[in-house]
């Protein structure tokens, strides 16, 4: 039935499919050795944007667009960022000249290191971040409004593929990331086909 297909789409959208990476040698390193975690500036609001209007985007908790635009920027380049409030733990890769407000944090590679692939890191870290945010419980045992501040990331150990000499391998990270992307694309393709069936009102 149509309802069954809709339910299947909803379920499939929530599934995190992880490719088999058993063939790789993995080391676990502290997140704090790989990245500096920095929270955005709370002064960046829509009102602030109206007073300092310009071409450079400011990103907030939402991954669906910008909060405002300023005449200055705090970062220039490609970075991983995460939402600290609301749908906390969701990672968004940003590229260009931009700023973030207090509802988003940024992961800056430690000492300018160049051996980290952001696609691999996003696929690896996002489930860990989301679980950390989801794990917070209120006094009554109910989930609180999720938050994920930099201080909450201190104890994370990151699984990273290493080469035969035990060094972090950028090429293996890229190889694994491509597997993630391939699986994700297949998942997206299935969902689109199911959506098409519904829109055509085909009886199943």
What is each residue range found by the language model?
Residues 30, 34, 133-134, 142-143:
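Long, hydrophobic alpha-helical segments that serve as membrane-spanning/inserting helices
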Residues 15, 98-105, 137-165, 170-171:
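A short glycine-rich beta-alpha junction/loop motif
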Residues 28, 55-56, 79, 104, ...:
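A residue-level signal for beta-strand positions that form part of recognition/binding surfaces
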Residues 109-120, 145-148, 165-168, 182:
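Short alpha-helix boundary/capping segments
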Residues 60-64, 70-131:
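A short beta-sheet element
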Residues 44-47, 68-70, 144:
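Generic recognition of flexible, low-complexity loop/linker segments
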Residues 1-64, 163-204:
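Non-catalytic DNA-recognition/assembly elements of restriction-modification systems
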Residues 129-133, 185-186:
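Short loop/beta submotifs within extracellular cysteine-rich repeat domains
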